Amino acid sequence: MSNSDLFESNMYKEVIKQYDEVTEFINLDSNIRERLKLPQRALTVTFPFRRDEYDEVETVIGYRVQHVLSMGPTKGGIRYASNVNLGEITALAILMSWKSAIVGLPYGGAKGGVAIDPTPLSKQEKQRVTRRYTAELLPVIGVDKDIPGPDLGTDEQTMAWIMDTYSNFVGSPQPGIVTGKPASLGGSITRREATGRGVVAIANAALDKLNLKYENSTVVIQGFGNVGRYAALDSYERGAKVIAVNDLGGAIYNNNGINIPELFKHIAKNKSVKDFDGADNFDDEILEIECDILIPAAVGGVIKSSNAENIKAKIIVEGANSPTTLSADKILRDNGVLLIPDILANAGGVTASYFEWVQNTQNYLWKEKELHDRLIDVLTSAFEEVWIISEKNKVDLRTAALIKGIKKVAAAKLTRGLFP
């Protein structure tokens, strides 16, 4: 059995396949090449959990993976989902390393997860899971060690419980232990919208390269959580036509553009985009609608070889993590679709988290405009660097982004040397 067999999963295989192709292309030293395929730390924990309505005790499994410790503290979200596994968490931690390096953040990548479906949990049940999971992570997390944040199935309330649990163990308030927490506890006022607005900023930078204008574009958004809804709002505010969106409840379409502020009001009342008066319900595949910009902002693996040929977008901006499979990626490139990869396109979230962490550690809050301006500057500068790498090496943007991220992480590893 090889070392990598410990982290077996389809997502891990895809991440390593991409990594192997890029490291072969840049001729990365074979010693460091093998080391970066594996995390430096991978913690598996089990703990008891009792539901509200009966006394039977369940055993819950959780993970925290830290990929690289050479860049600074590690950073990455915590997800709650029934299908969470070590391979998936490891793959996501590796991607966080590349993502942080691409936008110039002083972090290594990390990721955590609990294998439990959060949907049926009461608030008290979710709190018990969170506090016990946090207690199990105490040896490996810390303000200068590893800083969690929200992800699938977790939110700012989850982060508040983690902060409170950790602070009680340490004996003093520790707001910097997590990011993505409520503003009342030192959370960033822009964190919730940062990923979505960052996606649009990156898309706008790409359109500039093509001598196109965002305000003249049509936009389709798959997924209407935080990323999708703020990408939609920013697109609307820039004058683009958002012609289709969807969520778990259904999809809507209006060729003349959807009024996004009015859609927000509809969602507040009806909990879904479906049946919005300003658009038609839509039953066909939303990813295949003809548009200028397609933003997949839901889950991974939605663009695959079976539907890639049918995609009619000019530009795809990956708001979700790993929405495009490797096989689909090649088909899209061959068809002339410009694809901006997740490790660049959705880096607004981790960038805003970094700003939150800096403010917490300095006990000094920045104003909203300063946060927004810094976010856009970081993301557009990173895009410019990746574009130059792409042009220079005649490679697609995903490969160019990986070249930038992997080279930076490898350089830090090699410069620090071996211990002992």
Outline where the language-model segments fall:
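Short, Gly/Pro- and small/polar-rich lid/capping loops
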Residues: 3-46
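Rossmann-like adenosine-cofactor binding region
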Residues: 250-339
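Glycine/serine-rich phosphate-binding loop and adjoining beta1-alpha1 elements at the start
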Residues: 81, 100-215
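Flexible, glycine/charged-enriched surface loops at secondary-structure junctions
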Residues: 29-35, 104, 141-150, 173-176, ...
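Glycine-rich phosphate/diphosphate-binding loop of Rossmann-like nucleotide-binding domains
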Residues: 179-182, 187-290
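Adenosine-phosphate binding glycine-rich loop
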Residues: 2-10, 206-207, 313-420
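Glycine-rich, N-terminal phosphate-binding loop and its surrounding beta-alpha-beta segment
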Residues: 45-118
